[in-house]
Amino acid sequence: MAPGRNIQGTFKDLLILNQGTFGNASGQFNYPIPHSNYLSYIQLYIENTNGATSNTGHTIESDISQMRLVIDGDTVWSGEPRMLRKMMHYDIGKYPDANETQVGGAVQWCAVKIPFGQNDFDRDFLLPAHKFKDIQLQIDYAWTDNATTGFASSSSNAKITITAKMLEPTSAPVPTYFLARKQTQNTTFASTLNGTQQDINLPVGAGNGLVRRFMAHVYEAAKQDGVAITNYEVVLNDSVYLVKSTWRASQTEDQNRYNASVLKAVTVVKADGETYASRVGRLLAPISVPSVGDRSLGATVAGDTLTFAYAVANTGVADATADPQYLFLESTGVPYSTMIDFGTENIGNSINVTAPTVTSFKFRPTIGTITSSAEFDLVVEQVMLL
């Protein structure tokens, strides 16, 4: 199925909100999105200021639990910023823009994109904003203020800028297909599940359109990527196997298709013996931390977690001073995630989960080795027509 609308008109960049404050330490941020013409995407820039000494415990991604785009009461986009940014990572092939610094008083920020088309200038897939009475952006947040491990004065320092790319048509508006992304799973796998196969239900039935692709994510700190889930299947109606693969083979396919890789820059404030969970899987090389002044510095790696080792030069005596260290972390693929793709190259290959013959659609992972518990998330991308 292809929409074939090819809407004619002019694309324009729209500033919806500039440096709006969240206003509270926690709650739900609501903001109306213009409901006229067509929208190609909405772009969010969110920032907050670190505590006076440092911020070793919180990031923009960690303190926002959910983002939603609600259209006339229906949620068409939803997810944690970490997961929505992982989808961005696949689309652009690199770690999305962010400043994840732990330095005291510094500004952390990250970008989250909500695209409705296959690219920024897609004239076939657009959100027909003109069709709706109300479009609301909702963000659930709980900023943690702390002088050493959190943010500072978040009620005034936490800010958001909202922009969009809009198509102003030169002909009468018509309904169009658009892409929607929904986080359908946000749970944990316990170690008691090791060696078992789990059934994760994907959406089926009226209102769910076509499933173009979905992304699965599983993470446990200090574990290498591809350990918590070893292999998986995608099954239609409990009998038709659409995909059978291993986690690592699937990630290799992702690299070939999306050219996805990681080069993550981060400034951490750590002392001798302290750790940092980088959330970057299968690091390409050991971390090398340069010497500073009269100190020799280094770090060892276990899975995604770095343990820092500082010593006074020529003495071997541990140096407990916590200084900022600027790190480049590199790996292939999108960390701890894989994309199961049906319709990126041809929308017609997407799975029509509204068909009366479709009664179940499942992601079936085999759990490998989990030490304690691993977070598991799943985001589904659908082709919609409201």
Task: Please place each PLM-identified region on the residue numbering.
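Beta-strand-centric surfaces of beta-sandwich/beta-rich domains
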Residues: 1-386
